[in-house]
């Protein structure tokens, strides 16, 4: 078992010995290579359209490279240990541009909301590509990242747990719908070993999970809670919990993990 401090640094398994144990050595795809690619793009198209509809988003392009001095890149966590790939570029320039490959589009998206003149409760979505050279590589984490990044303009009064919960439910609705679509279109994917996504999410604060499993590091706490409920959304993963550790190290310059959001039995819990 990892100790709690070792277990803080982002997603994934954290040791290559554990990766070796968890990776199946007899894996066979349920679809052939061609149909796998077709299914991937069907799912991506469904989710893109679903997010656009549910969250009022427009699809935009995001840069792969930004100027290192722009402040647009993402350090991924609060201790600055995951640095971006940087290189000089600009043939013929007396002073080359110091370029930086994006690790995430988090800061750029907030600038882009203004650039695209989005109104309140309008937003953007982008199919972001990035390189995270300092990522631990495991069964579902790569140094190459291809992910959706979305952002929405909200009012200050929207900074509530109820608004966050409503947004998460809309996203989950899209995911469940995407699974149903791809299962119907590719019936080979209907395998009893892989049960369908639950229709409903269970919402819980990181402090409450710690109270249930006080002696376990957070990844094992996550495993226990997901075994109990099937699908879980965790509030408050960045604020320091009762045991002196945050649920996970989060970036200090854009994630809101300090806003008080829940009070139970006279106790304040932090972090959206």
Residue ranges and their predicted role:
Residues 50, 54-58, 174-178, 182, ...:
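Short secondary-structure junctions and interdomain/linker hinges
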Residues 42, 145, 229:
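Short, well-structured alpha-helical interface segments that form or flank functional binding sites
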Residues 92-110, 162-167, 211-237:
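Hydrophobic transmembrane alpha-helix bundles
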Residues 111-126, 180-185, 237-261:
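A short, terminal or domain-edge coil/loop segment
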């Amino acid at each position: 078992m990892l100790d709690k401090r070792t277990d803080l640094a982002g997603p994934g398994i954290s040791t290559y010995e554990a990766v070796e144990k968890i990776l199946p050595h007899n894996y066979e795809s349920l679809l052939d290579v061609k149909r796998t690619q077709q299914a991937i793009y069907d799912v991506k198209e469904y989710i893109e359209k679903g997010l656009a509809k549910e969250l009022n988003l427009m699809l935009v392009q995001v840069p792969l490279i930004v100027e290192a001095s722009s402040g647009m890149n993402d350090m991924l966590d609060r201790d600055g240990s995951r640095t971006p790939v940087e290189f000089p570029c600009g043939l013929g320039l007396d002073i080359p541009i110091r370029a930086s490959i994006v690790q995430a589009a988090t800061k750029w998206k907030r600038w882009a909301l203004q650039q695209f003149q989005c109104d309140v409760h309008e937003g953007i979505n982008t199919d972001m590509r990035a390189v995270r050279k300092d990522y631990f590589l495991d069964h579902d984490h790569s140094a190459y990242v291809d992910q959706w990044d979305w952002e929405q303009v909200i009012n200050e009064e929207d900074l509530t747990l109820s608004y966050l919960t409503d947004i998460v439910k809309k996203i989950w609705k899209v995911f469940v719908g995407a699974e149903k679509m791809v299962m119907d279109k590719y019936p080979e994917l209907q395998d009893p070993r892989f049960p369908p996504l639950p229709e409903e999410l269970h919402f819980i604060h990181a402090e409450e999970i710690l109270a249930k499993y006080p002696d376990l590091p957070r990844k094992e706490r996550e495993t226990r809670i997901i075994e109990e409920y099937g699908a879980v959304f965790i509030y408050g993963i960045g604020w320091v919990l009762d045991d002196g550790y945050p649920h996970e190290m989060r970036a200090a310059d854009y994630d809101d993990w300090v806003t008080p959001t829940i009070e139970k039995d006279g106790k304040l819990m932090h972090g959206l």
